[in-house]
Amino acid sequence: MSKKSKKSKENQKVDQLETSHKDGAGQPLTTRQGLKVNDTNNSLKAGPRGATLLEDFLLREKIHNFDHERIPERIVHARGSAAHGYFELYESMGKYSKAGIFNDTSRKTPVFVRFSTVAGSKGSTDLARDVRGFAVKFYTEEGTWDLVGNNMPVFFIQDAMKFPDLIHSVKPEPNNEIPQAASAHDTFYDFVSLTTETLHNHIWVMSDRGIPRSLRMMEGFGIHTFRLINEKGKAHFVKFHWKPTLGVHSVTWDEAVKISGADCDFHRRDLWEAIDSGQFPEWELGMQIIPEKDEHKFDFDLLDPTKLIPEEMVPVKIIGKMVLNRNPENFFAETEQVAFLPGNIVPGIDFTNDPLLQGRLFSYRDTQLSRLGSHNFHLIPINKPVTDVHNNQRDGHMQMEIPKGRTAYFPNTLGGGCPHMTSVDDGAFTSYQEKIDAKKIRARSDSFNDHFSQPALFYRSLSEWEKEHVISAYSFELGKCKEQSIVERMLWLISQIDKGLAKRVSENLGLDIPSKIEKPINQAIGADTKPSKNQPPKKKNYLESSSALSQSNTVFDSIATRQIACLASDGFNMSDFKKMKKALEKENAIVKIVAPHGGTIICDEDMEHPVDANIATTESVLFDAVLIPGGQNSIEALMEHAKFTKFVREAYKHCKAIAAMGEGSQLIDKIEVDAVREDDAILIDGTAKDFINAIAKHRNWNRMEKAAKIAV
């Protein structure tokens, strides 16, 4: 049995998709009607130089199809990458939920996961500073469940009514369609400065979470509070978390800008190549479970999507693992046409009254009609459930099935009463019977008003190097705004989060922090709402810090899939290279020779070695660490190329590990920083073990002050 067929047996969804695959290998070219084509290079003409004839149906079909190949891109999350995989449960959660996916540990539930940026268009860079979408489609035996989340646990806004305003503000400005995939402009900060509920998510975006090293190295969150329902009908509130086994790691802003120029498909390529090489990305699924009786015990509202529950208050219980082990066969058919709907749930999972979630339940289904062209988008192969589907919903554009029988209604006798309804005991879905005693009102709960405490908690929880990155991000973003009044309002709001943060940003901008701003502070209120209503109170300090919020507390135990650039030319020391390469690859790192030219280079033992990257076509920002084997001829050749010196200096600037052996240390000295050899992540004739440990730490952020002086 081939590796591919063995894999497919583990994944019911992939088996289903294979029935829709088309493979033209060894087949003749035909029209859409099956007519074999003799010439697809020339149109039908009245003579070789004559007019093209209208009767040329081959030309018309080919051009007609080309004219209609594209579909509208997603309004948000247009830029995406996806993969197939499976989810396995560690232990039964039947105490909390009757969902089969949370009870049966023998199942391998097929999943399709799409990662995305929010603001940019389909062709924008992967490395924009932005929230990342993290949407998981579970093809369960009880129906499809979509957990449509992000890589940040909180959202910008509290109510879906504000979503069009948010997106209109962050998208390119309508008068000139500038800037693309960027929040650093006036309309966005005009909105944020007047809508203070945005401040928590915004500081997450300003942190390193906004520019992840890899899609495989970021967390995922369900954002909303959902309900779990067990067999007895008892409910618990739940927040969903995805924890990457490789840890949570990011790049610097300088790297992100340069990666966007060197390889704007960096994240997409990284995900594809990792899966293609058998280094399958993994996340563990965790739950924060809260009894219904504890709904109001916190200093924040569980229904507020701009708030998180600190893990110190409610620990995350790890319940299972997701593995992505197969790339899509076709980007358009799968990644582009997949439709995620928060309204896709299964028995044992239910909604809450989160006002953002409630609006998403409508919006995600509604948008598919214009994007995919029909309400029958569930018949597109990637969207089809693996369970049998039988109902009385009929017809419409692009109906792909042929329903049998006379009846399309219920109740009926002519169809034997089928398809029949199912009792709850036999697996039918029923909504949770929540008691409701309220007046119909268009208003915001006062329990949603605290807009400063959690962003302050987030900032306090960061390490010093993370705080420096936040300061730089705010300084860059606000520095791009042209309206000083907007910037000053933002500075005042930041001062309510942390005065030290605001002071540093204001100094970088050359502006004073205003002592007061125009009231109401939060202007996202109704016309007849009292100006004092829905205003943020002064921040509370109900928790000094939360370790889970800082990337300095993530996993640092692996160099798997890390990209190591080996700088070498003719005459490089084979012994140095071979020894280090063997140790690195044993830990599943990827070592690539970067040389002054393509083709091959010859080592000091007169053996040829293929070059993986020509220095003219690559950059240091595409690698995690640098290896410089000895060999005087090799080092002299490298130092003749200014770009190799730049490569090493830039790797140092971005706080990466660099190992040099023998004469390779001469390139280290080109960094031209005092005591550079005393750096913990600069290894001169060090051991492979020491180099591996330095790479596993991701970066040596202790060198940031010195690194800032490096000009590259």
Please place each PLM-identified region on the residue numbering:
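Short glycine-/acidic-enriched loop or helix-start segments at secondary-structure transitions
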Residues: 576, 637-638, 668-671
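Glycine/threonine-rich flexible loop motifs
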Residues: 633-644
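Short amphipathic alpha-helix with an adjacent loop that forms part of the alpha/beta core around
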Residues: 615-622
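A charged, well-structured terminal subsegment
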Residues: 678-712
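Active-site-adjacent core segments of small-molecule enzymes
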Residues: 2-574, 578-581, 585-586, 590, ...
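Glycine-rich nucleotide phosphate-binding loop and flanking beta-alpha elements
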Residues: 572, 633-635, 665-667
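Short, conserved catalytic or adaptor-binding loops enriched in Gly and charged residues
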Residues: 672-677
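Catalytic nucleophile loop
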Residues: 483, 595, 625-630, 644-670
